UniProtKB/Swiss-Prot annotation:
GO terms for cellular component: cytosol; peroxisomal membrane; peroxisome. Belongs to the AAA ATPase family. Its EC number is 3.6.4.-. Residues 264-289 have a biased composition (Acidic residues). Residues 251-311, 443-480, 1096-1132 are annotated as: Disordered. This is Peroxisomal ATPase PEX1. Its main location: cytoplasm.
Length: 1227
């Protein structure tokens, strides 16, 4: 609805509506049987001067306009001016708001000091008439209030709860902030003339850490340090109080205002407007109505203000000189940085603060707690010192007394905030909390000259200070009597008059809360020796955790420095490569080269590697290195993408908006060229942990993943190019599992110009990791010179860096347990605590599963090469292909040829193909995964191919690894002969895995089959299973070798002739010979057991005969013992015949069990003394008579024909030579 405005003279903030609208509202209220009450209205108009549309909110209390104006609303001239300069007859858009929340609390402040003084005088009137003049308020509004319909005061609404637009009620709480008039001080004429515009300018410097030299008895209170040159340039004095705050967007605007300000006071900064633009979010809200839009915007702004006020705390500290800082730096201690959330290498805003503008608060109580610093995620990576000592209450009091007498003499006063931390000595940090107890808060009074001012008089001092500027100190001391402090006490009085007088006690509590809230957020407290000496003010918590305040220091990469490089082993090449790439962007003195080369202001590197390979450790080390390097002083910020993987695209984009904006704001890149700053913004390193979790390779079967990836990549690109700065570049370091797992569209040279692949460490690198991590932990090996660490490293093939470190940690724990046990046993072992025996490290390795092998089923074997007879040429070829590259890696790394990684074992069944694979698992020290052919086949489409991929994936995770496929012809037959097409797809998948561009590094494929002609020929070409080894039916010498190996595990008679046996077993395979020997052994065991059984029967018969003979000669007697009765008389009752019979049976049973137990013991002793069964020639002859070759003559000829054709197709002969098989050549 559009209406014109008519300005009139009235003494309230309500508007009047046209009569027809009022009539319609009355009819509506009667129809709904509801009282109409007041109504909230939203008005919108166009400002022609500023060329923008404005909005405001007003209330209607039932008034109607002059009947002559049917399309107009009326409001007071003062109200129109406060809304934004609404002119008479201006067109307004009007909209009724139905659901406006009742106000819980409204914070207002007088627009001028005159308004504040008038308000103090007319407190009672405001309480009675406020609701009669205004009922709708919103954040940022300026409200005119009439005193007795004559005098006008104006209030600015700073905050409304619970919503940005509220309706006042009798239960609403109104909080008024004081606006005292600045009183002139005693040095108005002299000192204020000395405060020039140059002094009042805000300065922007880079933060560096300040270390306390406790050896010189130095302590830390609340100080910052710059060099003398900067102090003179800024026209500051030693001991001046400086306001420290973060850089924000508004610093540019406020800086311009300060340049145009001709007065002595500068404009206040507003650091509460950090907004992260997201253009796409606006497009999603087009369907919302104007009311919901405005409500949402105001809610977001209100929430952002609260959050930023909490995070961007303003700190006050005195400034001193320290020559260790240069002209671009300010030294700030950890205590201040923790309270103010200031990170090292970020740009901070420093501003001189005049004495009369300090928000000094009276001290009613001081609560002191000991601060215990907790480790953060970065400090856990470096070696920490011993834990902090916990002081008792009496010790803290004594330390405070000694410290205050030494450091707060000469009437020094230091500005502290609530929660400020003071370092008493190297082991004791204390937090000071002021006026945090309700019982200790100074009660409000109605007189401006009451006890607070008198109490502060005791804090005044006229003595000179050698370290602090005398004029500045006098300014602060004299100013502590000004009405500013008294006005703080009078807030409770104003609030009690604005509300009803029936709840006086509740109003006093509210005023106390108001005072405490003001002091907690804005107030500073001047700490002095006199105050700390007052036992009534000082309180120290006692008992348990109440006396301790745990704080976590900021995660500053400066804390790490280059110390992590001392821990990292086996990465020298990667570290050098990363430094060469990053230094061009990080070093400030190379900015000229960047300009000449037209280097972009943004780039990055990708660190790829499996879990536990050291990606995060390397990225963190590089961040710490460039954070402490004086040539870069880079600002480091980290984002863990693992926390974003479940979020929607819109939320992920907002997080990246905040990440880039925060990094640029903290480093000072948002400062305009006109801002007065002494430093160049530092370069920025953004560490993106696990970037592939949110930007993974899109799935072809999921179109949504591709769209999501493209949206995020496009947004990251736009952010990089938006915030790029050649003088202060942005470098991203992303960690991923592999370059293939990361979306390819983001791997462009403009964003990521370098990719570093972290492979599993070699044998020498594992030794280096072991030695460095031991040294890093402050340990060393006992008799290290005589140890063969290379041999121990060879047993950890496939271990990653984290696995080696885990073994060292386990060994340290075992060593500590051993030391405790020695101390408990009073053993005089004087070995150094830092010495670790190598046997403990070997014990720590036992039972440990490397991270790459967890969840993978590996095959273990105890078969050695000497357990295999014959097959000499096959064994030699397997050693050359698999064992040698593992034993001599450097020799093969220098070879320019690609190593052979696929071998096919073929031959008749029972010729030792599977046995050879088992020997490889036991001899070569490689992980061994065995797969039976039919295990991979599945009737469902895609399942078999997925099984093949999973097998090769497990092998790659467990590398170096041997992947053995038995019965290979069953899963990889010739293509085109399967109606279902399952094996065809499996063969295609095998071809993809075996012939990849990257190759199977560290994975050896071993396949065994008896029908090589059935295997698809494509799998047998070079680069795949290119080496075929023939396992032949053993000949005479090979059979003799096999029998000799079997003899070593059996008890053979010396009279047996193995040569004769080898002659008699022609065409026997290795499996046949083993079965023959096992059958002979079983016959020997049966004969031995029969002999023992006959011997036992003979001995048993002899014992029975002897027992019968003895029983005939004598009869066993037994005596029945009868106990006495209670009266010591013996019972005379005799046993019955039945009872005697049962008793006799029990005695016979006991005797029988006794005899049998003796016999069993005797038999066991005899068995143990017996010799094991001996295999004689007779046993061999019986077994040979019952056995025959497992491969018949027809099958042998069939195999020979098959293998001959196979060799002709292959064009070469491999494996053992055999008569009747023609030799093939490559001619």
């Amino acid at each position: 609805m559009e209406l014109h405005v008519q300005l009139k003279h009235s003494t309230d903030c309500f508007v009047s509506l046209p009569p027809k609208i009022v009539h319609s509202l009355l009819l509506l209220s009667e129809k709904q049987s509801k009282s109409l009450g007041t109504l909230g209205l939203e008005i919108t108009w166009y400002d022609k001067i500023n060329k923008k549309e404005n909005k405001g909110y007003v209330g209607w209390a039932g008034g109607s306009t002059d009947p002559r104006f049917t399309d107009s609303i009326e409001m007071s001239q003062e109200m129109a001016q406060c809304l934004g300069g609404i002119k008479n007859e201006q067109k307004l858009k009007l909209k009724a708001l139905n659901n406006i929340e009742l106000a819980h609390s409204v914070q207002v402040e007088p627009l001028t000091s005159d308004d504040w003084e008038i308000m103090e005088v007319h407190q009672q009137y405001l309480e009675e008439q406020l609701l009669n003049q205004v009922n709708i308020l919103y954040s940022g509004q300026i409200v005119p209030i009439w005193i007795h319909h004559k005098t006008i005061i104006k209030l600015k609404v700073t905050e409304t709860l619970p919503t940005p637009v509220v309706k006042l009620s009798s239960n609403s709480e109104i909080i008024v902030a004081p606006k005292p008039r600045n009183l002139p001080t005693t040095t108005t004429s002299s000192q204020q003339q000395q405060i020039s515009k140059e002094t009042l300018k805000p300065r922007f410097l880079q933060i560096k850490d300040f270390k306390i030299d406790y050896n010189n008895n130095n302590t830390f209170i609340n100080e910052i340090y710059i060099n003398k040159e900067l102090l003179n340039q800024f026209q500051w004095n030693i001991g001046d109080i400086i306001e420290i705050s973060k850089v924000s967007k508004n610093n540019n605007k406020n800086n311009k205002k300060e340049k145009n300000n001709n007065g002595g006071d500068e404009e206040e900064d507003d650091d509460d407007n950090e907004e992260f633009d997201d253009d796409d979010d606006d497009d999603n809200n087009n369907n919302e109505d104007d009311t919901s839009k405005l409500q949402k915007q105001l809610d977001n702004k209100n929430n952002n203000n609260k959050k930023n006020k909490k995070n961007n705390k303003t700190i006050y500290a005195r400034v001193f000189i320290n020559d260790k800082s240069n002209n671009q730096q300010v030294l700030i201690h950890r205590n201040i940085r923790t309270i103010g959330n200031f990170y090292i290498n970020t740009i901070v805003r420093l501003k001189y603060t005049t004495s009369h503008s300090l928000p000094i608060c009276p001290i009613g109580s001081i609560l002191v707690k000991q601060v215990i610093w907790k480790q953060n995620s970065l400090s856990n990576l470096i070696k920490q010192q011993s834990s902090q000592k916990i002081y008792s209450v009496e010790q803290i009091k004594e330390q405070i007394k000694v410290w205050s007498n030494n450091n707060l003499s000469n009437n020094q006063r230091y500005p502290l905030l609530n929660g400020s931390i003071v370092s008493i000595n190297s082991n004791l940090d204390l937090s000071f909390n002021f006026n945090n107890l309700t019982s200790s808060i100074i009660p409000p009074t109605s007189s401006s000259s009451s006890s607070p001012s008198n109490n502060l008089d005791s804090q005044r001092s006229n003595n000179n200070n050698n370290n602090i500027n005398n004029d500045q100190l006098n300014d602060i001391t004299n100013n502590m009597n000004n009405p500013y402090l008294s006005s703080i006490q009078q807030i409770g009085d104003i609030m009690s008059n604005l509300n009803t007088n029936n709840n006086q006690n509740n109003q006093n509590n509210n005023s106390n809360k108001l005072m405490n809230q003001f002091q907690m957020n804005n107030g500073i407290f001047m700490l002095s020796l006199e105050i700390l000496s007052n036992d009534k003010l000082l309180k120290i918590e006692s008992g348990g955790n109440n006396s301790i305040e745990k704080k976590k220091s900021l995660e500053d990469y400066n804390e790490i420095g280059d110390r992590l490089f001392q821990r990292i082993g086996g990465m020298e090449k990667q570290i050098k490569q990363a430094k060469e790439f990053l230094s061009l962007y990080m070093y400030k003195d190379l900015s000229v080269i960047r300009e000449q080369l037209n280097t972009p202001g943004v780039n990055g590197m990708i660190i790829a590697g499996s879990h536990g390979s050291g990606k995060s450790l390397l990225a963190t080390s590089l961040g710490g290195y460039y954070s402490t390097d004086s040539r870069s002083n880079a600002f480091i910020i980290k984002l863990d993408c693992n926390q974003l993987k479940e979020l929607k695209v819109e939320n992920i984009r907002k997080q990246f908006n905040k990440l880039f904006y925060k990094s640029c704001k903290e480093s000072g890149n948002t400062l305009s060229a006109t801002t007065s700053t002494n430093t160049t913004p530092p370069p920025i390193i953004i560490i993106l942990e696990s970037l592939d979790l949110i930007l993974g390779t899109p799935n072809d079967q999921d179109p949504g993943s591709k769209i999501r990836c493209e949206q995020l990549v496009s947004h990251i690109k736009s952010l990089c190019f938006k915030y790029q700065n050649r003088s202060s570049p942005i470098v991203m370091i992303a960690t991923v599992i592999s370059s293939q797992s990361l979306c390819q569209s983001i791997q462009i040279p403009e964003l990521f110009g370098l990719t570093i692949e972290l492979q599993a460490p070699t044998r020498e690198e594992r030794v280096e990791i072991l030695e460095r991590y031991l040294k890093y932990q402050g340990k060393q090996l006992k008799d290290q010179q005589s140890l063969n660490l290379m041999k121990f490293s060879a047993s950890m093939e496939g271990y990653l860096g984290c696995d080696v470190e885990q073994i060292v940690d386990r060994s340290i724990h075992l060593s500590s347990i051993k030391e405790i046990e020695n101390n408990n046993n009073n053993n005089d072992d004087n070995d150094d605590d830092n010495i670790i025996e190598f046997s403990i490290i070997e014990k720590a390795k036992e039972g440990y599963t490397p991270i790459t092998l967890k969840g993978i089923k590996l095959h273990s074997s105890e078969i050695k090469w000497q357990d295999i007879g014959g097959l000499d040429s096959v064994r030699a070829m397997l050693k050359e292909t698999i064992e040698w590259p593992t034993k001599y890696p450097k020799l093969f790394q220098s070879s320019p040829l690609r190593l052979r990684s696929g071998i096919l074992l073929y031959g008749p069944t029972g010729c030792g193909k599977t046995l050879l694979a088992s020997a490889i698992a036991g001899e070569c020290g490689l992980n061994f995964i065995s797969v039976k052919g039919p295990e991979l086949l599945n009737k469902y489409i895609g399942s078999s191919e997925q099984g093949v991929r999973d097998v090769f994936s497990r092998a790659s995770s467990a590398k170096p690894c041997v992947l053995f496929f038995d019965e290979f012809d069953s899963i990889a037959p010739r293509r085109g002969h399967d109606n279902s097409g399952v094996t065809d797809r499996v063969v295609n998948q095998f071809l993809t895995q075996l012939d990849g561009v990257e190759g199977l590094t560290g994975v050896y494929v071993l396949a065994a089959t008896s029908r090589p002609d059935l295997i698809d020929p494509a799998l047998l070409r070079p680069g795949r299973l290119d080496k075929s080894l023939y396992c032949n039916i053993p000949e005479f010498n090979e059979r003799l070798d096999i029998l000799t190996c079997l003899k070593s595990k059996m008890n053979l008679s010396p009279s047996i002739s193995l040569e004769q046996l080898s002659t008699n077993t022609q065409y026997y395979t290795g499996a046949d010979l083993r079965a023959l020997m096992y059958n002979a052994q079983l016959k020997s065991i049966h004969e031995w057991m029969n002999h023992l059984e006959e011997e036992k029967k003979r001995k048993r018969k002899e014992k029975e005969d002897q027992s019968n003979k003895n029983s005939s000669q004598q009869q066993d007697d037994f005596i029945i013992f009868q106990p006495k009765n209670n009266d010591n008389s013996i019972s005379k009752s005799n046993l019955t015949f039945e009872e005697k019979t049962n008793l006799q049976k029990q005695i016979d049973t006991i005797k029988s069990q006794f005899i049998n137990s003796n016999t069993s013991t005797l038999n066991k002793s005899n068995l143990s003394n017996e010799q094991p069964p001996l295999i004689t020639q007779s046993h061999i002859d019986l077994a040979l008579k019952e056995s025959s070759p497992s491969i018949s003559e027809s099958e042998r000829k069939k195999y020979e024909r098959i293998y001959n054709n196979f060799l002709k197709e292959r064009g070469s002969v491999t494996g053992n030579k055999k008569e009747g098989v023609p030799k093939q050549t490559l001619a």
